[in-house]
Every structure is written in C-alpha cells, then in structure tokens.
C-alpha cells in the first residue's frame, strides 16, 4: 500500500502479482474511494488524526476481504503512520520501496 498523492496497491498471491487489482478505486466510506480518502488532499483537509483513522480502517478492510499474510505501507505519507497502529502483519517501509517494488514487478514480467 502506497500513501502519497492517492493510495496505491499491489496484491501478490504465492509470489505472483495479481494484475488489475485496482483496490484504491473501490468504494470505501461515505461514497468515496480508498484513493480519495487516503490521498494527500484528504490528509491536509481532514487533518492528520482523521486521516490516520481512515488509513487504519482501510488496512482493516483490506485484511477483511483479502486476509493478507502481510502488508507493507510506504509512500511519502507513510511517515505519518506507525506500524504499531496496524498490528503484527504490517510493516512501514521507506518511500523508495514503492519505486523498487515497481521495478521488481517489471522484472517479474520478463
């Protein structure tokens, strides 16, 4: 999960990317998508406390319908959350992890 201008996601199962899983475009709360409510504009307009609460709810929602083994949270706005907020399956990763992950996905497709 990448927290930045919006919310980016990539889902892997058994080490393989599940393509076209645009989770951030799915409805989330009050008629808004994950992308809208977790993006930078929402962080600025809603305030950090409400935005963090929405991030925690989003991670729980993703776990409810994906039942993930682990989730990596990165991006420019990941610095505003703590892994403690999400439990043992969550890891906060540096902003560069999203770029490196994208490169890795590109390599996997070859």
Spans of model-derived segments:
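ATP-binding/phosphotransfer module of carbohydrate and carboxylate kinases, centering on a glycine-rich
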Residues: 3, 11-110
């Amino acid at each position: 999960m990448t927290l930045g201008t919006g919310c980016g996601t990539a889902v892997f199962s058994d080490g393989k990317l599940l393509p076209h899983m645009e989770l951030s475009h799915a409805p989330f709360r009050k008629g808004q998508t994950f992308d809208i409510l977790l993006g930078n504009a929402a962080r600025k307009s809603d305030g950090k406390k409400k935005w963090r609460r929405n991030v925690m709810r989003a991670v729980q929602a993703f776990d409810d319908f994906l039942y993930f083994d682990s989730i990596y949270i990165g991006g420019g706005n990941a610095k505003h959350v703590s892994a403690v907020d999400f439990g043992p399956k969550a890891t906060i990763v540096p902003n560069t992890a999203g770029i490196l992950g994208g490169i890795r996905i590109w390599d996997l497709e070859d």
